[in-house]
Amino acid sequence: MIVTTTPSIEGKKIVEYKGIVSSEVIVGVNLVKDFIASITDIFGGRSGTYENELIRAREEALQELQNRAAMLGANAVVGIDIDYEVLGANGSMLMVSVTGTAVVVE
């Protein structure tokens, strides 16, 4: 399945719009990961712990989006938008939401 942030696909013609598709993935970040991330915050640098969680959540959300588009009979999703949110009282959860338009291209 073709998945793109652009509203069209070069060299392909959209022949049918199947509708808007979306998916959300929420992941919790546990105490051990928070501790490791806090050490990174103190000394500076990138937090591989949180980055890996974001990557995993984004990949899961994109896969779920493709599954939902396929259920509608689409073979592509255009206009993908990916949003990230921090949730929970202590910011202990991360949400990735993905939306796009399911289409049939040829």
From Swiss-Prot:
Name the UniProt record assigns to this protein: UPF0145 protein Athe_0545
Domain of life: Bacteria
Disulfide bridge partners, by residue number: none
Annotated coiled-coil segments of the chain: none
Pfam families, per database record: YbjQ_1
Matches recorded under HAMAP family: UPF0145 (MF_00338)
Similarity-based family: Belongs to the UPF0145 family.
